[in-house]
Structure formats: C-alpha cells, structure tokens
Amino acid sequence: MPPFLGDREDKVRGKKVYGRDFNTRDLGWEGACRHVYLLRVTFADRKYLGLDDARLLEVFTLLGVQPPEIIQATDLHARAFTAPYRQKDSSGRPRTVVHPAQGLALDDKSVVPDFFGLYWLTPPGGYADNIGQPVAILLFRESNDLRKFATWNREPSRHEGSPLLRFDASSRVEWQQDIQRLVNPLLGARAFNEEAIYGATHFIRSQVKDNEFSAQGHKDHDPDALGPDVDPAKRAINLQANKAREAIRRSVSEEGMTVLRRTFFSQSIDPMFMELETGLAFLTRDDECKRVMRIAAGTQSPRKDREGVETLTALWPEGEAPRVELKTYPIGGGFGGRDLSTFSMYLALAAFFCDGPVRLAFDRYEQFLCGIKRHAAVLQNVLAYGLKDPQDPKSGYVLHSLDSTIYMDGGGVLNLTKPVVQLCALHAAGPYRFTHNAISGYGISTDGAPSGSMRGFGIPQAAFAIESMIDEVASAVGADPIAFRREKLLTTNDVDVSGFELRHRLDTERICELAQREPLWTGREAKRAEYAARGNGLVKYGVGFACAMQAIGTSEDAVFAEVSVSSTGEVTVRSTAIEMGQGSETSLAIATRPLLGREASRVVLGVLGRFDHDTIQLNKAPYAPGQPRNTPKLDNTMSASVTAFFHIHAVEEAARVVFDHGLKPCAADIWGDVPEDARWEDGKLVAPGRPPIPMEELAARAHARAKEDGLCTGAIVHTYYRNAYACSEYTLGGTTRLRYIDGLAVLHGGDAEDVRGYQHVTRVDVPYDGVANDAKHHIRSVYASAGHLIAVTVNTRSGVIDVVDAVTLLDAGDVHHQRILEGQVEGGFAMGLGMTLFENVPPAPVGVDGRLNLHRYPVPRATHMPPSGVQLRLLPIPEGQQILRSGPPIRKKGIAEAVMTTVMPAIANAVAHATGARLGVLPLTPARVLEGLKP
C-alpha cells in the first residue's frame, strides 16, 4: 500500500487513530484519570435554583456509584474564573449582570469567548441560555460509574417526583414561544421583536430609476434601522436602502410582473459524524517546571480552540498563566459540527479542578443533545417575473426581483449564526440574474442546541427555496426547466446580490448545458408515461433538476504549510489542515509529486505550535509598510471546502521553493543548466538529451551544499486569500521571484524536526493590487458550480419516495485524486438525501430532551441510495485557462459542499414532475407527501 494511504490501513486494522481510541497511558500522562460528565439544565424558560444535593446523593447510593466531585458556577468564581453572567430577560435580549452569588463586581480579567455563549455553567438564580446547558461538572473516578449515572439521568423518570435540578416555576417567561412558532412550519412564520435576534444581514440592490442602491460600499446597511439612536451617516444610508426596497416592491405592480409567493422550511439536522467528540486534558508542568494545559482532542478549529482555552488560562490566579498545548487527532467526520465547538472549553475547565488528567467523552445521546446543528430555516420568498417585451409572448422572460426574508434558528448559544445567515442571504437568489433584490436574513435566539457551520453553511437552505421556485416558474410558463435556467444564469463579470462583480471563473451555464443532454433528462417524459401506463398510476415517476454556485472558502482564507526533504529524498509535509475523512492527508501527500517527483511519505496535520515559533511567527495585523511579518489572518478552521483551493496551493508553493532553491541548483551542477521542459518521471528528473537524475541524488547534494551555499531543504510558507492571493517578491540565493505567499521561512540542511533551524525570509512588500482594495467588502469570490439530476418514484398510496437514479454534475476543475472525489460525491449525496427524506431534529424542547438517538432519528442507508449508484459528470477546465482572473494558475476547486447543496431541491422538483405537488417543508415525509397530493 502506498505510504500516503497508510492512515486508511491503520483504520481498517483497528489501530488507534481517533481521539476516542487513546487514553492517558498512551500519552504518558501520570496519575489516575477522572471521567467528566456534564450535568445539564432541563429548562431554559425559568430560573435555575440549584442542585438538590440530598436527591443527588440518594441517586448515587441507589446506583452504587462513588459520589463524584462536583463543580458548579460558584466554584468557578472561587477559582477566580470571574466571567460575567449575562441573562435573558423576558424579551430574550441578553444583558450583562453581576450574579448575586458572586458578590463582586466584574474585573478586567473577565472573558467570555465570542463563540462560547453567555454562561460557562448556569448559576443558581439565572436563566440558562438553552436547554442542555451545563450547570455542573461531575468528576467520576470510574468510567463505569459515569455510564451508570448517565443512563439513569436520561430516563423520563428523572423529571418526575424529585428531580435533581430545582427551578422556580413562577419565574417562567414566554419569550421562546414566538421562536417555536417560527421554527414550526405548521404554525407558519412571522416576524419577531429585535430582542430575540442575534444579528441581521441585508442585501438591497435596486436599479429602479431615482432609487438606485447597491450593497457595494454599504456592507452594513440596514433598511429597518431608522431610529434617532442610529448614527446620522448610517441612518442616511439606511434610509436610501429602505426607499430602494419600497421602490422595488412598487415596481413589481407598476411593470405588470407576475408574482409567485412561497414559504419554505428546512429543518435542523445533526452532523451525524460517527466519531463522537472526545478528549483528554491535564494541567501539569513541563520540563522547565512551568504550568502547561495539555489537551488532546479532535477538532476542526485547532487555533480557535486553543485561543478559547487561553481565555481560561489567562484567569489563572497563581502566578504565570499556564501555557496551552493542543494535540489534534483525525476526527472521522466533522461537517461543521466541530467548528468552534465548546467541547475543548469544558474539557479544560474540568482539568483546572483536578490534580490529574481528565477525560470527556460524549455518547450519542449527549452529542444529539448539545452538539452543533444545522440551522433550521424559514424563507419567505416573493419572486416577480415577466416577459422581456410585454407585447411579444415570444420575447422570453426576465427575473424582475426577489424579495426574501430569512429566519434561521441559531439556538441558545451564538456560534457562527451571523456568517451563516449572511451566506444564506447571499445565495438566496441562487445562480440567477435578477434585476433587483431585497433580501433580509435574521439569526434567531432559541432554547435549542447551538447551530453552526454545518456542511453548506446556509446555502442548502437557500438553494432548496430558490431552485424550487425557479422550477415552478418554468413550469408555469411552459418552458423546459433547464433551458429556462440557462437564459438567466449569472456569468463571470456579472454582479451578485450584494452588487459585487463576479471576477473569477463561473461555470454554472456549462453545468446546465451538460445536464440538458443527459439521457436521464431527455428520456424523462417517456419514462413518466411508462409508469403512468402501469399499475393504475399507483407509483409515479419524475425527474428533477437543480443547480447552484457554491462559495468556496470564507471571506478571507489563510493557511500554513511546510515541505521538507531529507538527505535520502524522503518528503515530509506539515500543515494546519485537519483530517476528518475528506482525504486531506492523502491530498496533501500527493501535492508534492509534480514539483518534487514523489509524494510525501509522511504528513503531519493539525500543526499549530511549530508555526508559531519565533523564527517563523507572523503577526496578526493588517498589512503595513515596514511590517514584513504582518498578515491579516493566521489560519482557517477546517471548513468551507478549503483543501483543494487553499491547502494544496500552500503545499505546492512550499515545494516550489524547495525545488527552485534546493534541488534545481544541484541539477544545474550536473547538467550545466535546467531546461524549462525538465520534468519528473519515476522519481527521476529528466530532460531531453540529459541523463536522468534520481531524487535521492539531488536531495543528498542539496543537504551537502546547504550550509555552505545556502540551498533550501525545507520551506514553510503562509498564504492569504481575500478575493485574490496576496503576493510578494522574495530573494533567495541572489534570485528574486514573485511568489503567491505572504510569509516564508527556509531550512538550510540539518534536521527538519527542529523548527529552530528555519530562517525567516523577509518579503519585499504585499502589493495592494494583489489583494483587491474592495476585498474586505466582498463576501465571497470563488465558486464551484454543481447540479443534480435525480429520478424518483412516488407511491401515491403510502407517500414513500424512492430515489431510483441520480447524476451529479460537477465543476471541480482538475481532479487531484479520483477516488477521494468520488467519495465526496457519494457522501454529499447521501447527506442531502438524509436531509430531504429522513433526518429531523425537532425544535426545543423536544429536540433537546436528552433522549434523541438513532432509534428516533432515521438516517439514510445504502438501500436508500440509487440502485446503480450516483453517476458523476465532471466539467474540465479548458487547457490554458485557470480559475482566478489573475494570480497563481490554480485549476482545482473545493467541492465537498457543492456535491450536497442541490440534492434537496432536485428531489423536490422530481416529486413535482411526478405528481404535480410542490412541497416546501423538509423532510419530505410520507405524511407530507400524502398531504400534498390531496386535491
């Protein structure tokens, strides 16, 4: 088996790979391990009064377990964790208070991480942020004792008679009922008081005469914020936006447009990764007898997790704050569910109260209860369309405007709701060219578990709504649904709903062109007629299509990468990337092959401390003259389909430095020069008329000359992307070259394991034309286009939908690894299938009652997939072209999210084609199908 697939061999052989596999002995940590259980509130709409200590002791005795040590909110204060307690009043607005139990004013050391929420532990006398928020940390000596108590605690009887937690029933508030009305589609959506809103996003773009307006230059405009307390300059802009929105609405009737009004609901779902959140922590001392908080856990966001724990260690009352070391493990699935999770914070909190190591390991019940979820969403859309020429029925149709109001359930703790709402709003109009748009999105605070950056980041919710509506409009005007789409697609140089130009390559039109020629599409009517002619119409057949342009990355993306070559030619890659089943380890290993002639034999992921070393360290600060170590961002969380476009680019840039300034000079010594057409074949550098040079020989020569001649045997690079790749000139070995990186350190021989051997290379500058001046206002700039053709059968008696055929059409660019790509396609389809037909986390309080597990949460199985599998159609980039308008010649796109975004609307459109029923509430359960089939 090739070395870069070794991780998969370890998994199938049952070796220790994931965080759950390891114990403290594996890490060499001394002392008895305590097992952590988080005791959680069962209500968030009334004051929590405290634990019933007598009842708790009675339960421990009943179960025959040794009573654990119990840490509560007051214990945090006693250990100087004096973070502010902020409570929700009856309106739901958070407000900062000093809790009476503290008896002290807040001081400068009070810190609550932005992504953590309002409480660490709910204090007596306070309202919890959400059902399931911890009120106490229990430290058990035996893991079996913990499991006994956890099993007892989730039984319904715990709520009856003598519950463990005491609440003040007279303090019940009703603010959350409005939220339940929002997320319950059967009761309908409605507007809410601003006090219940985490944040809002607006995209108003009007071309109405005398009321022109665009979000370009007015990123934070709010057409509803017109009060006297608003800054006058902002109020003036907001007033313009408000007038523009009203002008758009008036123009619909004035121009005689046809209006389609629809409300769509997409449910909350669980990421359902197989490897549950697990970790170990130990507050101990290092070799220099300094305190260190060691954490070993799986995470998608190692830097953010470490920074979060550092907010705790900064409160350490006894001398110098402990240093934080974070060791990461492959996580066996993330899907956004481990992105800015609070797990590491609670793990560290427990370690502060124990003189030995601690272990926190969620079971499936706990993961369902408190893990990050996909946002439930309501989209109220008003789509206006009409003939280009009202006098000519054959003139074709124009999309006049989209007026959309979006509500997303953010749960009780603010995770990444604001950017998710923003991206959902940005994609509300899909890949289509509307003349005007008035889009508003709101993140809502509820009693439920926190919602975050689950796969798709708000775009699947938007795609379900707009693709269903476009399909319905095409049907209403008697047009082929794909042909109708093709006429109205955004292309490169168009503007998005925020008014910004789409500068880079966009291939949605080619996706639709390919789909229109597919046999599954061209034969759909004949197949539907065939089904209609048999079985008295009991089973109906239909084919649906949906497409999307899926944003890649975040609004700004930064990564570190290191490539080093040993004296024997072995290649090592280190990266801030995280392996979570998407194949990053393999992808980065083979990324070195084009430049170094072989794949890396060793890949180290989740690297943090090494890239923060003094010899390499960059400063997180805006670019500025005379500040060659400044960079606006250090690195990303592992999300947003970043491997292909961002991490591989960084590895390639590091490998290029090693080749240009390490191996190439050695080849020139042998050949006299290195021609442009030199290339690698079977591990040897070859060129016409020149003897092949083995990689091992070049590596040995580079190491031998490294110290004396300054040849590079290793390189660490940092890249930064914000609408364009930052670039600068670097001088090495007397040669100056422009590179699409903003940080560089090189190794001149020696042991690459010792990061102290690296030397920082000062960049010349970061040209402002390399990072567009308006980039900070440009929400997204690179997109992967995708589409699905899906055939279904609908049993009109049972309401059961079966997917019988499927084609994924994908704009992935150059394929880096075919099997990994195919795995993403199949996995994305399965996830989309689950969201469409099966999965559902009910709104609070039912969805957070602590008893949700796979017996109550159906997921798709292999038998639910199309019998012949998911067919894949790839859209290659023509030779000589690239994704970016300017900059590095990147030809690969991240597609992990694009492959699932359009599954939901494609199935819904297939059901409509089969039955005529347009369904706007997910999941499409048999009961909802039968309801939709009623006359």
Descriptions of predicted regions:
Residues 5, 65-66, 73-76, 99-112, ...:
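C-terminal catalytic domains of large/alpha subunits in multi-subunit enzymes
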Residues 380-402, 563, 789-808:
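Active-site and channel-lining beta-strand-loop segments
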